Amino acid sequence: MVSLNQQWHVIASSEDLPFRHVYQTRLLGQELAVWRDDAGEVNVWENRCPHRGVRLSLGVNVGDQLKCQYHGWKYDSGSGQCSFVPAHPGAKPSTACVRTFQCTEVNGGVFARLEAAGSEHKPNNSAPIDAAVASNLRSHTVPMSATAAAGLLKEAATLFAPVLGSSTDGVQVLATGLIIDLKCAGLLDTLR
């Protein structure tokens, strides 16, 4: 059986990656930096510099490399391999390498998966990613009362009970892009 980490997921629309921009998103709890190099290739990387752990989405897309904002280390498009350390410009670059993820761009959508699967097939989406789907890729804040939030959490726990088993500690509801940490929401006791 293929795990969620091995399946392709839409993480951005092509419009989210304008020239030399770095886009930040999450997939199954993994924070990602998504960017397009000047040759048009999309990169999906763990959103942490291997040097000091700073978010790479705060960095600079310099065309064929992503430059960390903190110490200026540069990582090559595609491989994520460190290619330049400003403190040692004449030395061989560090062996540091950003964790990269498989990605592809299909009909206006950027797809990624966190683990390689046995099959190397790419997502086959013949329909373009429309505005309604693209808008769901973004975060939305919806004000609601504590009573409404408790009701939503009860429904989510019921809906995902077959997947989650009997434990609801730290549940993340990711199916619609809505992430709820039940412990932080302070409503865990309400669900029991």
Protein language model regions, located:
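Short functional micro-motifs and their immediate structural scaffolds
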Residues: V54-S57, K74-D76
